[in-house]
């Protein structure tokens, strides 16, 4: 491939060892002008091992995904891309989206291409400047962190994989300039209350079953694109972050005499797709991924590893152990079943039965039968979209045997999100399980392990919402017509 620059023909050369592409036009320097000491930036070999690209070769090599400039979640730094194809492979293997067959760019914003990219050519969309702008405008900045964030962020600061760094992150966020720091497990508990109630209502009416979880925006986007016929099977509940944002902007601001127009809410997430979700659900003003927060902490030279542990602020403070396990595949299912059991029986689960271990694990599609009183619930858990097709086709065709299905886009659930620190791919499964185990361990240690037992949730319903599925709850915590992208251009 040749280009002209001021009468000079510019070429591209590919490293025969690692595939790195040297583009004379981008570098503004001919390959022949490079000194003998120059070496490949990727693998270090000499320039003599570079071959000039011809048309046929560039077609074979140009295998990176296209990222629309308006993509709300992911950005691509073109001059870092070496066309290795890892991003395409991730999208095809994990999502089942075959890029060569695309007639237009299809993206569910999950960021698994970001995780696969070794060159950092694909990154979560950087938006830290929006936080700085809000601070300069004198807004009250409020942060809330998702469960999976606290078991991954320590990895970037030399801590062991699976270290539970919640207290240190609260301290860091305060140093960054957040006036209040809340726990999204509170929003997860609220989601459980609404979702368990919705499931029981659907079971009683035998309507729109099976019910799918709806807190993963990449899964919702996938369903909208490939299975629009099943959208009425998705729970109408907003995600924990969606509910948390609404409660901060409404309940919390009202209780604390704050002007919600002068409050700036920031969700700290493992998930790139949340950047897309908040465009459709108001309440949260900004999403910063774990990798963005890591950059902010490092740029401010905060000694994260040696920070003291701080507590969350109260009134929308901490959640239960059930809210904590939302960050793991099967966690939403298990948390919802704990509360559904209580709502159906009016009795607490016995201590030795509170863990629904049948729904745990790393198998991409799992199923279980859960007996609650006279009801036997058939449930399924999916955490890799490429493996979801069989179950989704059954729901589409009206032949599904299930009552309740949890779907998470990323392997391992939120702990494997596109905005998390990258893992060595040869050890990824093992390291994801360490993150998951940290969440389950925190659940086991909590005094409150069921969402309905959280006193702050009880107070919220008594003071503000009334009861699950009330008119106010539906107005603030549910989507009337479930299409995240109904206003997409």
Report the location of each language-model feature:
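Short, Lys/Arg-enriched N-terminal segments with co-localized hydrophobic residues
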Residues: 1-9
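Iron-sulfur-associated redox domains of electron-transfer enzymes in respiratory
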Residues: 5, 124-489
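Non-ligating segments of multi-cofactor redox enzymes
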Residues: 12, 18, 37, 46, ...
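Iron-sulfur cluster-binding cysteine motifs and their immediate structural context
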Residues: 12, 16-26, 41-56, 75-76, ...
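Short, intrinsically disordered, charge-biased short linear motifs at domain edges
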Residues: 25-31, 66-72, 77, 96, ...
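A short, sequence-level motif marking secondary-structure junctions
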Residues: 26-29, 55-56, 381-388
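Short cysteine/histidine-rich metal-coordination sites, predominantly Zn2+-binding motifs
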Residues: 30-38, 55-63, 101-106, 126-137, ...
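Residue-level recognition of alpha-helix initiation/capping sites
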Residues: 72, 82, 108, 164-165, ...
């Amino acid at each position: 491939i040749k280009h002209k620059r001021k009468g000079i023909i510019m070429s591209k050369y590919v490293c025969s060892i690692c595939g790195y592409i040297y583009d004379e036009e981008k570098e503004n320097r001919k390959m022949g002008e490079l000194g003998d000491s120059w070496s490949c930036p990727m693998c270090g070999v000499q320039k003599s091992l570079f071959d000039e690209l011809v048309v046929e070769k560039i077609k074979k090599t140009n295998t990176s995904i296209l990222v629309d400039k308006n993509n709300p979640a992911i950005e691509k730094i073109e001059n870092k891309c070496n066309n290795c194809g890892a991003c395409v492979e991730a999208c095809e293997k994990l999502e089942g989206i075959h890029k060569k067959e695309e007639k237009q760019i299809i993206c569910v914003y999950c960021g698994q291409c970001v995780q696969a990219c070794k060159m950092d050519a694909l990154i979560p969309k950087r938006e830290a400047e929006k936080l700085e702008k809000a601070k300069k405008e004198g807004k009250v900045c409020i942060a809330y962190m998702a469960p999976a964030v606290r078991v991954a962020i320590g990895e970037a600061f030399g801590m062991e994989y699976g270290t539970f760094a919640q207290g240190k992150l609260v301290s860091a966020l305060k140093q960054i300039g957040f006036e209040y720091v809340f726990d999204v497990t509170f929003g997860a508990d609220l989601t459980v209350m609404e979702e368990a109630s919705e499931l029981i209502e659907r079971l009683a009416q035998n309507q729109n079953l099976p019910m799918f979880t709806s807190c993963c925006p990449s899964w919702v986007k996938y369903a909208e694109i490939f299975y629009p016929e099943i959208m009425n099977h998705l729970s109408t509940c907003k995600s924990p972050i969606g509910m948390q944002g609404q409660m901060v902007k409404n309940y919390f601001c009202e209780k604390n005499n704050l002007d919600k127009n002068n409050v700036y809410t920031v969700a700290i997430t493992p998930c790139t797709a949340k950047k897309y979700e908040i465009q459709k659900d108001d309440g949260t003003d900004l999403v910063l991924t774990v990798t963005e927060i890591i950059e902010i902490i490092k740029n401010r030279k905060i000694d994260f590893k040696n920070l003291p542990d701080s507590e969350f602020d109260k009134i929308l403070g901490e959640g239960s152990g059930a809210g904590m396990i939302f960050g793991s595949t099967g966690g939403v299912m298990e948390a919802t079943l704990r509360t559904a059991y209580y709502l159906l029986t009016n009795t607490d689960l016995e201590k030795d039965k509170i863990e629904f271990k049948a729904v745990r694990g790393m198998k991409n599609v799992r199923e279980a039968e859960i007996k609650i009183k006279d009801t036997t619930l058939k449930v399924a858990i999916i955490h890799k979209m490429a493996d979801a097709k069989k179950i989704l086709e059954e729901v589409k065709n009206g032949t599904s045997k299930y009552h309740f299905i949890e779907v998470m886009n990323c392997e391992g659930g939120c702990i494997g999100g596109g905005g998390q620190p990258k893992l060595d791919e040869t050890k990824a499964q093992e390291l994801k399980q360490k993150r998951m185990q940290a969440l389950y361990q925190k659940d086991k240690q909590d005094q409150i392990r069921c969402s309905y037992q959280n006193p702050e949730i009880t107070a919220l319903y008594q003071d503000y919402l009334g009861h699950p599925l009330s008119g106010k709850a539906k107005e603030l915590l549910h989507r009337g017509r479930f299409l995240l992208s109904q206003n997409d251009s």
